[in-house]
Amino acid sequence: MRSVSFASAVALCLCLAPEMLAQGGGGRWRRPEEITNRTGAFFTDIAGPTADGDKVADLATLELARTAKSANQMVVLYLVDGGDDQDTREQFESTLFANDELGIELKFFHCARIDLAKEPALKTKYTKQAPLFVVFDASGKPVELSMSGYKPQTSALSKLLEKQAAGTVKPSLAGFAKTYGGIIQDLEQVLSKKKQALQKQAKAGGDQGKRAEADKDVKALEAEEQKILTKEKDLLSKVRLPERDAKAQRVGAPRWGGRGGAPGGGDAGGGRGAGGGTGSGGGTPAGGTNGG
């Protein structure tokens, strides 16, 4: 995982301080959609495999798993019981998926969530292991990671993704996540500074001196933003990311204005973006995280 120096962390906090205050203080702040679309964990809700009474087919028989295997692509299945306590689930997901680099690594996988509360036979089989992650490599070989008791294991999940991606993502999934994470961090800082500059520009009114200064700052920050986006585009052009399903939802997002439904709700995912844009209307740049 990418480590951030103390100086960088302080600089980022200073840049984002006004936004944190705008959200009511307490250290809570809403990250721009341009950032969460790049770093969030997006999953598509799907039904489990066919069941005959208390017997259920193997997870590898899912259409998503079979289609991904035929395309030499990877899959992450998230099995969770939507009947469990919602606060516990949401805290688990919020903690587990708070790491940007994990969200970046998930971009290389088709990600789907199965609600065990709606799958009696599957629940009987996996209830002791859930929440459970099943990660299929490009050849269709699955490896399971149980987080029973809702104990988040971010590092363990990341290492499993990296293991299953070995040989498929080159030179390495961890290396890509570290590089892309740095680009996104730079972009987030510039977007924050640009937002503040635009606010100063709006408040300048008829003061020509203040407006000229604000205009200069905005122009410089927009130029810096474009440099970062070009760097991002160059990096993404070297990899192939699976399409994000239009029904994908962000899992682990903070609840700002209410609670979602079982098993977790979340922000809408959106489709594949054009690559490099930071507008809030599009999807994730140059590919997404989810199949379905």
Predicted regions: what is each one?
Residues D217-K247:
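Amphipathic alpha-helical coiled-coil segments
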Residues A7-E19:
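Bacterial N-terminal signal peptides
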Residues A202-E213:
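Charged, low-complexity interaction regions
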Residues G26-G103:
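Local sequence-structure signature of Cys/Sec-based thiol-disulfide redox active-site neighborhoods
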Residues L21-R28, D245-G292:
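Disordered, low-complexity segments in secreted/periplasmic proteins that are enriched in proline
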Residues K128-S172:
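Non-catalytic, surface beta->alpha helical segment in thiol-disulfide oxidoreductase systems
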